[in-house]
From Swiss-Prot:
Gene source species: Candida glabrata (strain ATCC 2001 / BCRC 20586 / JCM 3761 / NBRC 0622 / NRRL Y-65 / CBS 138)
UniProt similarity note: Belongs to the DHHC palmitoyltransferase family. PFA3 subfamily.
Reactions mediated catalytically: L-cysteinyl-[protein] + hexadecanoyl-CoA = S-hexadecanoyl-L-cysteinyl-[protein] + CoA
Name under which the protein is recorded: Palmitoyltransferase PFA3
Chain's gene name: PFA3
UniProt enzyme class: transferase
């Protein structure tokens, strides 16, 4: 089992690294339309920065609840029954709870789950501000490494587009010179072009999506959770004379730049280079750097709290089961 787990982690990492190194080799061997002294330094620099960011993305990790002893649950039954309570500082600054109003707890990790924290069944840990599990580096994207993940995507996009342009120019020159009449096209060049074409299209789409998520201060999990929650609200409204408003992301601070800075940092250097994000004066007593608490949109929070009673009354009217009791922002 350990051998299988190790292979499943090493294979995508070796594959990604290998593709970068092979593409560099292919560029050196096949690209002649532009002088090597002009192309190679630029391509090599982008590739090395991307690989360094990739390594840092893996090394830093997403951050987990196991790193904080204060989140440990000593008796799961007592926690589920409400006899063991989460740390007071966690309760005061948290906005997401279970449908029955109790604080979220992970039975697998025996730990309390802060806002935006979710259990990854593949990694078997609770990840702080979990975005998704990425198969391309066999790990999770979370609070600590989300910045490096976004930067890696940007570097990959720039690199793949640059390689596509160079290989396309080389193939165009080959056709224009009518070399196809006397020789077959270089297989390595053709492979490089096809790889660059596929990767540049797919990675560009995913990069744009990921950046838009950061600008909304929203994780992939929260995106689908919000959709599901609003669908439930729409269903409940069919039976109500007092419609409940759908909700929006409570962590969206209202401006794209502010949301971007929450993840990527507060300076151009932090945005461009794979360096750790510096805390700011907006952080909640330094806790924001730990991934346990997050700044929220006060207007959204106020609106959501005002609608709780109405939603709770409607749910109780539709069913007597307490499992459907809703407290605060249960959309996550």
């Amino acid at each position: 089992m350990n051998l299988v787990n190790n292979f499943s982690k090493l294979f995508p990492r070796c594959l990604t690294t290998g593709l970068y190194l092979w593409s560099l080799y292919a560029i050196v061997v096949c690209i002649h339309v532009i002088r090597a002294r002009v192309v190679l330094p630029l391509v090599f620099t982008i590739a090395m920065v991307a690989l360094y960011t990739y390594a840092k993305l893996i090394y830093v990790g997403p951050g987990t609840t196991k790193e904080y002893s204060i989140l440990r649950v000593y008796d799961l039954n007592a926690a589920e029954s409400g006899f063991e309570l989460p740390p007071e500082m966690l309760v005061k600054r948290s906005y997401t709870q279970k449908r029955n109003g109790r604080f979220r707890v992970c039975k697998s990790c025996s730990s309390w789950k802060p806002d935006r924290c979710h259990h990854c069944s593949t990694c078997n840990v609770c990840v702080l501000k979990m975005d998704h599990h990425c198969p391309w580096f066999a790990g999770c994207v979370g609070y600590r490494n989300q910045k490096f993940f976004i930067q890696f995507l940007i570097y990959c996009t720039v690199y793949s587009i640059l390689v596509l342009i160079l290989s396309s120019m080389e193939i165009y020159t080959w056709f224009k010179g009518e070399f196809f009449e006397v020789e077959l096209i270089n297989f390595t060049l053709l492979s490089l072009w096809l790889l660059a074409l596929v990767v540049s299209i797919s990675i560009t789409i995913f990069t744009v999506f990921s950046i838009s998520q950061v600008c909304q201060n929203q994780t992939t999990i929260e995106l689908y959770s919000l959709r599901r929650y609003n669908e439930e609200v729409a269903f409940l409204n069919e039976f109500s004379n007092e419609p409940i408003k759908g909700t929006i992301n409570i962590f969206d601070l209202g401006k794209k730049l502010i949301n971007w800075e929450e993840v990527m940092g507060y300076s151009l250097i932090e945005w461009a280079l794979p360096i750790s994000r510096r805390p700011s004066s907006l952080d909640l007593e330094g806790s924001h750097s730990h991934g346990l608490f997050f700044n929220v949109n006060k207007n959204v929070s106020k609106t959501m709290n005002e609608s709780v009673d109405l939603q709770d009354r409607l749910l109780r009217r539709l069913t007597p089961r307490s499992s459907l009791d809703v407290d605060r922002s249960n959309f996550v």
